[in-house]
């Protein structure tokens, strides 16, 4: 029984996992749905019209503190999850980066996945319910291969390496990429990987050592 248990406890072999091209995948989100930064001459009136309680008050406090930090030449670091990118807010974040208001961005590994896919094909967010049924969930090969390539760059953080790669590879929709814009503007974009929580970690091409090292560089 102990021998069987030891055998059963061996790590699974990922080499036989089947991947497919992301170009064949149905996506739930595309760049046509993205938000766009626009100028509002009287936007202050809208902000002032909001209730003086709870979320609206919190929003005003965030705005005030960002403005104060910017005016005092302090750092404004945006820490985001993947939904900021998935839900079409990248262009607004990029606009704030270009204006010198956001001075650094920290994102999780899923954020990097969405950012890369949007830069490559102009869409992201697979149909999870469908792909779980047929076993294809997370198996788009281009995303995993690109992030692994970036992670393997010596002494470079994953965020910068992936941003550089998006620019070097001339991804068709790179103007929607926070990672690429960070590399172009030389603004720190850090990616904080959590092994096992992101779809690409199932791919045979992925090196846990490279993921850990490149993300640790970003952490530092």
Please place each PLM-identified region on the residue numbering.
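Metallocofactor- and cofactor-centric catalytic cores in central/energy metabolism, strongly enriched
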Residues: 1-220
